[in-house]
Curated annotation (Swiss-Prot):
Listed SUPFAM superfamilies: alpha/beta-Hydrolases
Entry EC no(s): 3.1.1.3
Short name of one Pfam family: COesterase
Record note on quaternary structure: Monomer and homodimer.
Gene3D superfamilies tied to this protein: alpha/beta hydrolase (3.40.50.1820)
InterPro entries reported for this sequence: AB_hydrolase_fold, CarbesteraseB, Carboxylesterase_B_AS, Carboxylesterase_B_CS, Type-B_Carboxylest/Lipase
Stated family: Belongs to the type-B carboxylesterase/lipase family.
Biological source species: Diutina rugosa
Keywords: Cholesterol metabolism, Disulfide bond, Glycoprotein, Hydrolase, Lipid degradation, Lipid metabolism, Signal, Steroid metabolism, Sterol metabolism
Residue positions of the active site: S224, E356, H464
Molecular function as annotated in GO: triacylglycerol lipase activity
Recorded catalytic activity of this chain's protein: a triacylglycerol + H2O = a diacylglycerol + a fatty acid + H(+)
Identification of the protein by name: Lipase 3
Residue positions the entry lists as glycosylated: N329, N366
Amino acid sequence: MKLALALSLIASVAAAPTAKLANGDTITGLNAIINEAFLGIPFAEPPVGNLRFKDPVPYSGSLNGQKFTSYGPSCMQQNPEGTFEENLGKTALDLVMQSKVFQAVLPQSEDCLTINVVRPPGTKAGANLPVMLWIFGGGFEIGSPTIFPPAQMVTKSVLMGKPIIHVAVNYRVASWGFLAGDDIKAEGSGNAGLKDQRLGMQWVADNIAGFGGDPSKVTIFGESAGSMSVLCHLIWNDGDNTYKGKPLFRAGIMQSGAMVPSDPVDGTYGNEIYDLFVSSAGCGSASDKLACLRSASSDTLLDATNNTPGFLAYSSLRLSYLPRPDGKNITDDMYKLVRDGKYASVPVIIGDQNDEGTIFGLSSLNVTTNAQARAYFKQSFIHASDAEIDTLMAAYPQDITQGSPFDTGIFNAITPQFKRISAVLGDLAFIHARRYFLNHFQGGTKYSFLSKQLSGLPIMGTFHANDIVWQDYLLGSGSVIYNNAFIAFATDLDPNTAGLLVNWPKYTSSSQSGNNLMMINALGLYTGKDNFRTAGYDALMTNPSSFFV
């Protein structure tokens, strides 16, 4: 028995997977039986000290002979800061706050820029498998690859006969990754979190062949903030997605997120948050505020960050930290860049959940009257004229039967304004942004989806980020799209090669004849038209910059 156990352990050690990096270093990963994983590989120098808030610097140390068998730490996280806990019963609250996406992610460190590669068992260099590069979500405030396990997707790809390699890149969030303000603009350090992602893509281009991946077959995909990040990489450098003369990616998948409705790095709100952050960190009177911030402790910066509003605060989707036009890599407002055709021309999938706004509507339950709703919208959308606010409120009336969660009649109106505000927030940030993108993007084949899988769920409906449950943890009709169809798209640039029971139609415009959406519900898949809430679309998208934050 002891001999058999010893031989088993020897065989296990001998079976540990290896990969050779572009610089000649050989690293060892973890044999997880159903897959092989290389976890926590550094791709950038620690962004600490003088590198804090700055562009990432490629990692220059030797990794030869090292083992990468566990995830690296999460980047520093902001407290999402909810105000609704005492106002709402436990049913919906538990659903939101106990989900992995909204739980605190530990351990945390500023030294966090690592990348994870998971491949089918037995994959060797030369296999040239398609690569799916995941960008996690979390409102640009929280998140980590550790809460989005790729095992289900990689295993399904093997069962489908379309094996892929899954890569997940860590990136700085909150103040560490998306601090704005005049000082940041002057230094050219804006959007550091996006630059982390971009450097991770370059690492993949240089090294993935040594793991058995094909650097010419990379699909970038993400959810929520990750989805918006994918859009940012489509328009990065006015659409130039090349590195060393070759494209960094050949396709994109966006799950709940497109253009970020944001003012420039040196805009009014970015400076307001910067001033609050600097003051909270004790650097308000410093002659060189950034130098002061770079000398502060991590705990000091964490406290200062948590003193700014999170996405579950009253200000909700008026986020403190998010990608902003910087005049360098994101050269203009994102809607204009898409409208002007300044994007990488690649095939895309983009889709939404039917009730994207309900989570964010929970933070304004003290808004109960029509007058208070108007004041809330005026405070949230400082660029909108009185006439534009009037048009918005007419398109999204107080009538609870028209609000979100949609198609629920008089039910789920936990306040007279909850369903109304939820509808506006969900449509602005997700639903109508997706439709705007699809109506203007002409860079490649387009597919779109809309899920109503949880339409019977009280208060929340088919809420934002529920797709992660089906993508990473459970099976069901959603999983067929978020796994099988996405894998087929990454492999063949056509989701229909997954053998879907319903043909997924191509999307040309929201007014095209015939169906243009793949619809998901609890019973299965069907197709539909992207022609709902047109008055809301017109109110929000006729002049999108009026609703920038």
